[in-house]
Curated annotation (Swiss-Prot):
ATP binds at K312. This is Methionine--tRNA ligase. Keywords: Aminoacyl-tRNA synthetase, ATP-binding, Cytoplasm, Ligase, Nucleotide-binding, Protein biosynthesis, RNA-binding, tRNA-binding. It comes from Streptococcus pneumoniae serotype 4 (strain ATCC BAA-334 / TIGR4). GO terms for cellular component: cytoplasm. Pfam families: Anticodon_3, tRNA-synt_1g, tRNA_bind.
Length: 665
């Protein structure tokens, strides 16, 4: 298996805000490839993670009144929860604040400094905090000038404002490696997918002459300090790019994964906006370290809206959580992979999203499965007849289309062309639906002399749907399993040597099939998605006049002296369990910072069926509530605060960095 080691990475995401479907696309796309390669017999290592250093993170933390570490800790929890929701099968989640990564970054910096690939100089230029990138005046999308014509600022290509920065900095000698990089590109034209982007890098960035790259900063502290000059922190691109190597154990005692997977096939997938850093800075950094370069760099386009890029101010941002909660996971995975052509941007519209669910998933695939299961139950008491080739005049055509679809699917998957891979699957689905119309099994069933033909039709239908279920497994795992379950077949374990004729004997379908994709009301669901998108738009604030505010209260007003009697503290959940004899109560053991753990009973069991998810959370409690006896044998020493809205209840938690026992007031 050593020759079939495969390493796939997402970019590490910058945790400065909530991730939308653009980031979800990249992560799902890598997940699809990882799952496909596993099913093709590869030993796969799939990496994703977060780029947690930098000035923007430091500023966000200061705005929130917490430490940068506490800020990124909280963001990491949210990102991991999103990847769990999207069923991402990553093998490791790296954070650039991980100790092992920071140590290697510092070591590499000093090594490059010692071999004169890094030198100390001074940088002056326009800098975008949001992009973590420097720009020349000619690179700015818009330039601001004063009345005398002097440049006073500008806008980066990303749309973010820039500021003038002048500071001492270390530089990476990119110029020294320019010729070697050009030679590598010429020898490996397949290095960047899609075709054309490699020439774009040569034409726009390399041929005009590579400038040495600033790789340290002194104006903020949230980063990896340079050991020999700690007033400098290592700037984003050395720190961030090295994650692909450090995650596998590069320059560490435990380096088995690096030896194994870096010497296998290495694929990086990134958005087109960060292609330059991955196609120029990263290869040169690896050349400096005398490390093999990756095999493929896949730079995909963006999901845009009818009115341009996603923007909260436009009210057109789409978050994956909303789509999954409303329509399930598989429609989202299918839509994103089907709708972004290689080398181009894709457009998201609510109309197209709902339409693809109804027409391609519910009609094409769902109805095919329902009709097949229903007919096998009706004509053969649920027993799928043995597969026999060529009984009807249409069997050969279906078999040929199936074999061609399988071959095309593999070709497009190897090229990471997901829209065409799925198109190959839907070609088979369409042909199978047509096969039903051509063979007319309801007519065959009326003539006992045509029983063999009817049996062949049923077995060919089941065999074709089985092939479809196998091919969609990397994209839509739940759907694949649901289809195979209704056919009475086992889950997919391999895509190698898949064939229509390779159908198991003695298989019984379920007694009654269920729709795998219920049809949606187009008008209602389109309106729902638009409403959710509009809800993501920041509210326009009107001028606030406190004298005009009318307070809306559920209870009578109290005096400040009354409220001041209540002591609210931060407490950490140490243990939680269901209370025997009650379907409402949970029993908590909490550390409220006063030296001894306390017990509180709370009637929230129905809102937290998996109560263990609360362990480790920091909650707010009323600490000086008089203890009371409950269920005859328990004493509850306080109250845990929660919020209720629309029948849903959520415990009020605080940032993990806040110490136990902290008083809230």
């Amino acid at each position: 298996m050593s020759e079939k080691n495969f390493y796939i990475t997402t970019p590490i995401y910058y945790p400065s805000g909530k991730l939308h479907i653009g980031s979800a696309y990249t992560t799902i796309a890598c997940d699809v490839l990882a799952r496909y390669k596993r099913l093709m017999g590869y030993d796969v290592f799939y990496l994703t993670g977060l780029d947690e250093h930098g000035q923007k993170i430091q500023q966000k933390a200061e705005e929130a009144g917490i430490t940068p570490q506490a800020y990124v800790d909280g963001m990491a929890v949210g990102v991991k929860e999103l990847w769990q929701l999207l069923d991402i099968s990553y093998d490791k989640f790296i954070r650039t604040t991980d100790d092992y990564h920071e140590k290697v970054v510092a070591q590499v910096f000093e090594r490059l400094l010692a071999q004169d690939d890094i030198y100390l100089g001074e940088y002056s230029g326009w800098y975008s905090v949001s992009d973590e990138e420097f720009f020349t005046e000619s690179q700015l999308a818009e330039v601001f000038r004063d009345e005398a014509g002097n440049v006073t600022g500008g806008i980066a290509p990303s749309g973010h404002e820039v500021e003038w920065v002048s500071e001492e900095s270390y530089f990476l000698r990119l110029s020294k490696y320019q010729d070697r990089l050009v030679e590598f590109f010429k020898a490996h034209p397949e290095f960047i997918t899609p075709d054309g982007r490699l020439n774009e890098m040569l034409r726009n960035f390399i041929e005009p002459g590579l400038e040495d790259l600033a790789v340290s900063r002194t104006t903020f502290t949230w980063g990896v300090p340079v050991p020999s000059n700690p007033k400098h922190v290592v700037y984003v691109w050395i720190d961030a790019l090295l994650n692909y190597a450090t995650a596998l154990g590069y320059a560490q005692d435990e380096h088995g994964n690096f030896d194994k997977f870096w010497n296998g096939t290495v694929f990086h997938m990134v958005g087109k906006d960060i292609l330059r850093f991955h196609s120029i800075y990263w290869p040169i950094l690896l050349m400096m370290l005398d490390v093999k370069l990756p095999d493929r760099l896949i730079a995909h386009g963006w999901f845009v809206m009818k009115d341009g890029k996603m923007s909260k101010s436009k009210g057109n941002v789409v978050y994956p959580e909303m789509l999954v909660e409303r329509y399930g996971l598989d429609p989202l995975r299918y839509y994103l992979m089907r709708n972004l052509p290689v080398g181009s941007d894709g457009t998201f519209t609510p109309e197209d999203y709902v339409g693809r669910i109804n027409y391609e998933l519910a009609n094409d695939l769902g109805n095919l499965l329902n009709r097949t299961v229903s007919m096998i139950n009706k004509y053969f008491d649920g027993q799928i007849p043995a597969y026999v080739e060529g009984v009807t005049e249409f069997d050969h055509v279906l078999a040929e289309v199936a074999e061609q679809s399988i071959a095309d699917f593999h070709t497009h998957m190897e090229a990471v062309d997901y829209p065409r891979a799925l198109e190959a699957v839907w070609t088979l689905i369409s042909r199978t639906n047509k096969y039903i119309d051509e063979t007319a099994p309801w007519v065959l069933a009326k003539d006992e002399a045509l029983r063999d033909q009817l049996a062949s039709v049923m077995s060919h239908l089941a065999a074709s749907i089985r092939v479809v279920a196998h091919l969609i497994e990397p994209f839509m795992m739940e759907t694949s399993r649901a289809v195979l379950t209704q056919l009475g077949l086992e889950e997919v374990s391999s895509l190698e040597n898949l064939s229509l004729a390779d159908f198991p004997a003695d298989v019984t379908v379920v007694a009654k099939g269920t729709p795998i994709f219920p049809r949606l009301n187009m008008e209602e669901e389109i309106a729902y998605i638009k409403e959710q998108m509009e809800g993501n738009k920041p509210a326009v604030e009107k001028e606030w006049n406190p004298d005009e505010v009318e307070l809306k209260l559920n209870k009578d007003e109290i005096k400040f002296e009354d409220f001041d009697k209540v002591e609210i503290r931060v407490a950490e959940v140490k243990e939680v369990s269901k209370v025997e004899g009650s379907d409402k109560l949970l029993q908590f053991r909490l550390d409220a910072g006063d030296g001894e753990d306390r017990q509180i009973l709370s009637g929230i069991a129905k809102y937290y069926p998996n109560e263990q998810e609360l362990v480790g959370k920091k909650v707010q409690i009323v600490a000086n509530l008089k203890p009371r006896k409950m269920m005859k044998k328990y004493v509850s020493q306080g109250m845990i605060l929660s919020a209720e809205h629309d029948g849903k209840l959520t415990l009020l938690t605080v940032d993990p960095a806040v110490p136990n026992g902290s008083v809230i007031g």
